[in-house]
Amino acid sequence: MPNWLLPENIADVLPSEARKIEELRRLIIDNFHLYGYELVMPPMLEYLESLLAGAGHDMDLRTFKLIDQLSGRTLGVRADMTTQVARIDAHLLNRASITRLCYCGSVLQTRPNGLHATREPLQIGAEVYGHGGLEADAEIQELALASLALAGFTQVRIDLCHVGVLRAIIASDVQAQKDENALYTFLRAKDVPALQEMTLTYGADTRRALLALPGLYGDVTVIARAREILPKLPGIDTALDELIALAGLAGETSVTIDLADLGGYQYESGVMFAIYVPGLPNAVARGGRYDHVGEAFGRARPATGFSMDLRELARLLPDAEPKLAIRAPWGREPALRTKIGALRKAGEIVIQSLSGHENDQDEFECDRVLVLEDGNWIIKNLG
C-alpha cells in the first residue's frame, strides 16, 4: 500500500479549501461573540465514560476508542463536542446564571454521517445553558440561520421536530417502552413495514399513533393534522404548541414539520431542528434541546444548541478568487525590511520572491511589485 494513502472518508484539506474554511470560521465565531457567546476549547480525547455520559448508544458506536498508556483506562476520541461543552458548563464553570458558550474543533467518527461525508468533521456550534423557555430555542434557531447566511446560504429550509411527541405516545404502553430504541431507529428511517410488525402487540391507540408519525411530514399544516390524528395527551399538546411557536419565529425561512425526524433522540429532550440547503440531501446544521445531559456531570441544567460541519459548508461554496498580493525581491536591507513590514502591518500580502521562482504563486495573484527607485522602495502595478 502506498504511504500516501489515507483511510476511507478521511482527507487532507488543501490550501484553497483551507482558506475558505478558516475565513468562514472567523466570520461565524465573530458573530457568535456579537450574540454574547464565549469560546471554549474542549480536549480531543477524554475518558470514555465522561465522553459518552448522557450521549446514548449511537454516540458509543461512532466513537473511536483506545487505551491510555499512562492509566490503562479506555479513552475516547470525541465524535461530537456537545457533551464536552455541557461538562464544562456543569462542572467547571458552575454558574447559576445563563451561560452562552461556543466552540469549533475537529471531531472523529467511526462511520460517516452520509454519502461522501467525511469522518473528520470540523464541528462548530453554540449552546445556551440555564433557560428552559422557548426564548433560548428561538435564539439558537436564529443564530443557526444567521451563521448559514454568513456563509451565503439564505435560501434554506428548517425542518422542525419534537421528541416529546414520541415519548408521550410510548409513555403509557409498557411494551412500547421496552422497544423504545428500536422504534426510534425505525421511525428515523421511516421503515413503516418494520413498525407495523413491531407494534402488533401494542395497544390500539399507541399502534395507530406510531404508524401515523412517518406520514406527518410537510408544511406547518401538519401540526393541525397531528392534533386530529394523535392521542389527546398533555405531552403531545405541549410539543405541538412549541413547534407552532418556533415555526412562527422563522420569518421568511421555509419551514417544514417532520415528526419522525428524530436524529439525536436519545439525548434530546424537546424541540429539534435540521436545516437543509437546495441540492444537498443531508442537513447542514442540526440543533435542539437536551436538558438532561448535565445530570451525568452532577448538575442538570436546561440546555439548547446547534452545530454544523465547516468542512461541509466550505465544500458547498464556490472556489475563492486568488488573493491579491505584492511581489517583493528577497533581501535583508533595512529599508526593504521596513517597507515590507509596514505593508504587512497595513494588511497587505507581501510575498518575497526566491531566486528562480519569481512567478510561482498558485494561491495568490501578484498584481503589484515592490521596486527600488531613486533610493526608495515603491509599489508599481503589474500588467
UniProtKB/Swiss-Prot annotation:
The keyword ATP-binding does not apply. GO terms for cellular component: cytoplasm. InterPro entries: aa-tRNA-synth_II/BPL/LPL, HisRS-like_core, HisRS/HisZ, HisZ. It holds the Pfam family tRNA-synt_His. It comes from the Bacteria. Its main location: cytoplasm. GO terms for molecular function: histidine-tRNA ligase activity. The keyword Coiled coil does not apply. GO terms for biological process: histidyl-tRNA aminoacylation; L-histidine biosynthetic process. Keywords: Amino-acid biosynthesis, Cytoplasm, Histidine biosynthesis. Pathway: Amino-acid biosynthesis; L-histidine biosynthesis; L-histidine from 5-phospho-alpha-D-ribose 1-diphosphate: step 1/9. It is found in: Cytoplasm. This function is generally fulfilled by the C-terminal part of HisG, which is missing in some bacteria such as this one. Belongs to the class-II aminoacyl-tRNA synthetase family. HisZ subfamily. Heteromultimer composed of HisG and HisZ subunits. Required for the first step of histidine biosynthesis. May allow the feedback regulation of ATP phosphoribosyltransferase activity by histidine. This is ATP phosphoribosyltransferase regulatory subunit.
